[in-house]
Amino acid sequence: MNKIWKLKNVKVGVAPILWTNDDMPELGGDISFDRAISEMAQAGYQGTEIGNKFPKDAKILLRELKKYNLEIASAWFSGYIISDFEKNFQDFQKHCLFLKALGAKVVVFSEQTYSIQGQNKPLFKDKPYFTNQEFENLAQGLNKFGKWSKQHGIELVYHHHMGTGIQSLKETEKILELTDPEFVSLIFDTGHFAHAGEDIVFCLKRLISRIRHIHLKDIRKEKINELKAKNLSFLEGVKQGIFTVPGDGDIQNYPLFFELLAKNNYQGWLIVEAEQDPRKANPLEYAKKAMDYLRSLISW
């Protein structure tokens, strides 16, 4: 039996993508906002991240979340620092002020210049790469974005992501080395590192000092092999069931992962996030399954 590790100053949430996929409305498009947040609370979660079906008015959103005692942990922001800095900076400022009004402390940033994550292109074959100059430009921009957000009480966490210029451990380490730790931190996504062929415990050891937010997923290796063999896109892989909730897939070293988080005194949110087809994977059942698995390994 695994030891249960105590994580202090940690909250556990679940992302709305279990219920509705914003990138593929055919996955859960019929599931209402209220059903999603009520089931999050029913499964025992403390908070969530913002999805497309969430009210755009902060007061209305807070009122709805209060019914279920849920908080907003963060929200995704699509970055275009490399290709359209000025407009992106304005959009980022608005986004951060909205998050601040909701009581969130973290903004999830992912550079989408050249990204193929939403395109019908082979995920591994057509993965984009940034030049050294683009890395430098991105780092300078991230420092500016992160400095501004910090002044407004929001921490910028960079999201390494499949199908983007920062996908691997090596690419993630490069952008962290080029940025100021005072202004740029990391969101560690177990599913995206595992999907990229990385070992999550090895990555955690390398990156722990910069991690301020965590997404927890699991992967099905046979589905990744199928994606590679058939040259499928990222979204096609999601539809095939590459991702699932922690404990339901092929990541074997979650016990050690949580032990390292505890020993390094990780503070922040743990967000269960596993995009699947809700017709095949009932969201409430999978949210509960993930919660049961987490409670077998950690307390908070």
UniProtKB/Swiss-Prot annotation:
Superkingdom of origin organism: Bacteria
GO molecular function terms noted in the UniProt entry: manganese ion binding; myo-inosose-2 dehydratase activity
Database matches in Pfam families: AP_endonuc_2 (PF01261)
Keywords for the protein's UniProt record, in alphabetical order: Cobalt, Lyase, Manganese
Cofactor list: glutathione; Co(2+); Mn(2+)
EC number: 4.2.1.44
Catalytic activity: scyllo-inosose = 3D-3,5/4-trihydroxycyclohexane-1,2-dione + H2O
GO biological process, one term: inositol catabolic process
Enzyme class: lyase
Similarity-based family: Belongs to the IolE/MocC family.
UniProt cross-references to NCBIfam families, sorted A to Z: myo_inos_iolE
Protein name: Inosose dehydratase
Organism: Mesomycoplasma hyopneumoniae (strain 7448)
Lineage: Bacteria, Bacillati, Mycoplasmatota, Mycoplasmoidales, Metamycoplasmataceae
Gene designation: iolE
